[in-house]
């Protein structure tokens, strides 16, 4: 993991956007002047396709485990497996693919790797089998109540806890947390879900069922503007959005330093826009685009 900075970002798509990070990370290391000096990459999270322990999103990552671990080792970055299925049963713990992934992540890093979990059953299993893997309490638990968050933060098995994005604006309450609990809070910054959604947990449960191979229909979102899908501009208008200036002027001074960027189910072009917005100085954003994909012969239409 990088030398601790004021703000640590936890980035999406370890397997899903391997090719993007293969191009971005050399630039990030060789041209640190392009990027804000008050932030660093804390981890990259994701899962390959076909993982029954997976949750949150249906993974479609095509990179091999060897490629991913080699990239993480080269840049000293922590990798997190997103295993946040909420409906796991005891028989699922024997899954060969997921066990092999945990074994490789436990043994294959230059810095500690971790697992994002929802299921207590899985969390207990991982602690017994691979104590070297740290655990992150998933936002799929939909912790919208401050008392619930405090209870989760008090659990010693979790190094980090990601509350529901609707707790993001509750800074007056969040400031009352002791410093050791503030250090565990990881805010989901750029969620585009409707702030008034009452079916968020049900939506995640549908993904869990599909990852287990159950034949069930997709969750039908009832948000007023659901048909438009994810738009970063829409996420920015949410009361739960945490932008760059929010991080610098509100959250860092309050003692919080971990910020999660969502995007595993999106396209790599949009994830690059997240990297530009959250990490890149405005005067260098064009240079980053040119290095990653933009050239003088690129046609959009």
Model segments located where?
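Active-site pocket-lining/capping segments in soluble small-molecule metabolic enzymes
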Residues: 1-148, 152, 158-301
């Amino acid at each position: 993991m990088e030398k601790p900075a004021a703000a640590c970002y936890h980035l999406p798509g370890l397997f899903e956007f391997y090719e993007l990070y293969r191009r971005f990370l050399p630039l990030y290391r060789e041209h640190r002047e392009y990027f804000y000096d008050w932030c660093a990459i804390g981890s990259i999270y994701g899962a390959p396709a076909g993982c029954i322990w997976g949750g949150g999103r249906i993974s479609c990552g095509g990179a091999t485990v060897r490629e991913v671990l080699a990239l993480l080792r080269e840049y000293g970055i922590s990798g997190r497996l997103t295993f946040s299925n909420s409906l796991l049963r005891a028989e699922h713990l024997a899954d060969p693919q997921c066990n092999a992934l945990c074994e490789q992540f436990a043994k294959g890093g230059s810095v500690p790797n971790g697992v994002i979990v929802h299921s207590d059953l899985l969390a207990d299993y991982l602690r017994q089998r691979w104590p070297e893997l740290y655990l992150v309490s998933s936002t799929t638990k939909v912790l919208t109540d401050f008392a619930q968050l405090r209870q989760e933060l008090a659990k010693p098995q979790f190094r980090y806890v990601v509350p529901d994005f609707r707790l993001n604006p509750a800074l007056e309450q969040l400031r009352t947390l002791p410093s050791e609990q503030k250090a565990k809070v990881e805010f989901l910054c750029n969620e585009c879900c409707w702030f008034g959604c009452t079916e968020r947990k049900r939506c995640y449960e549908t993904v869990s069922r599909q990852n287990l191979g159950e034949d069930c229909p997709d969750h039908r979102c009832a948000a007023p503007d659901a048909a438009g899908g994810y738009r970063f501009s829409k996420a920015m208008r949410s009361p739960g959005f945490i932008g760059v200036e929010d991080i610098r002027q509100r959250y860092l001074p309050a003692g919080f330093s971990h910020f999660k960027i969502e995007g595993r189910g999106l396209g790599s072009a949009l994830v690059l826009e997240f990297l530009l917005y959250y990490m890149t100085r405005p005067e260098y954003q064009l240079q980053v685009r040119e290095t990653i994909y933009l050239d003088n012969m690129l046609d959009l239409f």
